[in-house]
Design a protein with these regions (language model features):
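Intrinsic-disorder-linked linear interaction elements in eukaryotic regulatory proteins
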Residues: 1-317
Length: 317
């Protein structure tokens, strides 16, 4: 069973930074600001499809006002890239991140915290595409900038580098990164802040693969409870943690519990992310594996066929 590696990507949480570089006309500034606020709310609620046109319009306004390579355009590029990433549109997200990175390096210098932000996001995109050799140096560079500038947001890259290692079975390297990141977030935000649940999921997955099942179950249940309280039962992060908990139950032979959670996870992902998202394909693959292990071959074949159809639509070209 595959657990879905959670990841942290900076998007609308830092949008206000882009407003300080210049003084655009009041009409367009007001419109862009309103779009930004709406997009932030939708993004945090996991409503990425609804956030997408707002991000696209915000970017268009910035480009019209400042030109395509101005510093004010970098944040809208980054945010649109992150929303496309969350929609599974990796090939669309990559050039947006690369443009944002080039602008920030040119205007802010190579060691600025906002450069580290985009390095993290691009590195995590490569992780999602299993381009680990490209992801690792970007995430390490992001961490190095954070350490140099004493920026606590380096926890983002710590988590995602840990996910790169975990995806490759390098759990002894992943666990310390997850623990370090989780400690930083809990100290800064408190033990029940939903921002910390991403690291809970990643650390739990590493524990599963090291056969520390009780520790993993505790973290995943906590992650589900915190995220449901903050965002409701259909949020993508809830679905992701449910998938991971189901994978744990499947390993333990708790098949009925695993099937129930896989189905809940798939239903929530389809509702919030759409029927063709890569994360949904991952849950369906896990459910198909559970069916196969129980000798339910017709169910397994039907479920796997659906997953393969999603993969064919979303696989990078």
């Amino acid at each position: 069973m595959k657990a879905l590696k959670a990841s942290i990507r900076v998007a609308v949480t830092a949008l206000a930074l882009s407003l300080s570089f210049a003084a655009p006309s009041h009409a367009e500034e007001d419109e862009a600001g309103a779009l930004t606020r709406q997009m932030k709310q939708l993004y945090r609620a996991g409503k990425y499809t609804e956030a997408l046109p707002l991000a696209q319009k915000s970017l268009a306004l910035r480009e019209k006002e400042f030109g395509p390579d101005d510093a004010n355009v970098a944040m809208p590029l980054n945010d649109l890239g992150t929303i496309q990433y969350n929609l599974g549109q990796y090939a669309v997200a990559e050039p947006l991140y690369k443009r944002a990175l080039a602008i920030r390096e040119k205007t802010l210098g190579a060691d600025h915290a906002e450069v580290a932000m985009v390095l993290n996001n691009l590195g995590d995109l490569y992780r999602a595409e299993e381009r680990y050799a490209e992801a690792e140096p970007l995430l390490k560079r992001s961490i190095a900038i954070g350490e140099k500038t004493n920026d606590p947001s380096m926890v983002l890259a710590l988590s995602n580098l840990g996910a790169v290692y975990s995806n490759q079975g390098r759990y002894d390297q992943a666990v310390p990164l997850f623990k370090r990141g989780l400690a930083v977030l809990e100290k800064a935000l408190g033990p029940d802040d939903p921002e910390a649940t991403v690291l809970m999921n990643n650390l739990a997955d590493a524990y599963i693969n090291r056969h520390r099942y009780a520790d993993a179950e505790r973290l995943l249940k906590r992650s589900i409870a915190v995220t449901e309280k903050a965002f409701g039962p259909d949020h993508p992060d809830v679905a992701q943690a449910q998938n991971n908990l189901a994978a744990l139950y499947a390993r333990q032979g708790r098949n009925a519990e695993a099937e129930r959670l896989f189905k809940r996870s798939a239903a929530a992902m389809e509702k919030t992310l759409g029927p063709n998202h890569p994360d949904l394909a991952g849950v369906l693959e896990n459910l198909a594996g559970l069916y196969r292990d129980q000798g339910r071959y017709a169910d397994a074949q039907q479920t796997l066929k659906r997953s393969m159809a999603i993969r064919a639509k979303t696989r990078p070209i």
